[in-house]
Amino acid sequence: PYGPAAGPNTQLAQNIIAAYAAGSRFFEVKTVQVMDGEELSKCVSKPCITAADECYNCEWSTELYVPQAFAEYVKAWFACKLLAKELELGDPDGFVFNMSVGYDLKGIQSPKVDAYIEGMKDASGTEVWRECMDWALANLDRFEKVDEAYVRGITPHVSNSITESTLHGCPPDEIERIATYLITEKNLNTYVKCNPTLLGYEFARKTLDGLGYDYI
């Protein structure tokens, strides 16, 4: 399966839904960190990517507050489950949401980010999950193939995998500490992201050229 990496394209529910309808099945939802919302916007000018073609996505984390980002991802998850059944877009369990968190262990262990991780692992006790469930049950007449049993059977386990995102210059032992924490304490299938800025210019240049992107 393929799909969008964490970025502006996986920040809002409607963008994730559009990607799913277009054929994507693996979604790395936009990175969250302890610095969010207004605090982040004062630190980093947004948006910090503008491109008419392929580009490096070395952007920071979500422009939303962490609870807002969580709500977007849950809404997208629920909507994709409904669309999979209603529009017969394939196995309703045939797509994956992959969390992305950064950028240091202290921030990832903060109550804010920890609540996000636990909510993505099981959203059943959250307000946004109840809102999605209530809406779907109240609007069953809009569907032809979705019934009450299907809606109530939608799993609240939005994600059991996570991508560790770190900034260039992050010490290797810090990367290892984060990965160890996510695997052993959070019990998550863990990916370590190697951004172009971490790989070095020569490797990134050779890789792009080899794929035909020599004009970048």
Name each model-derived stretch:
Residues P1, A5-I216:
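Active-site entrance/lid segments in N-terminal catalytic domains of soluble metabolic enzymes
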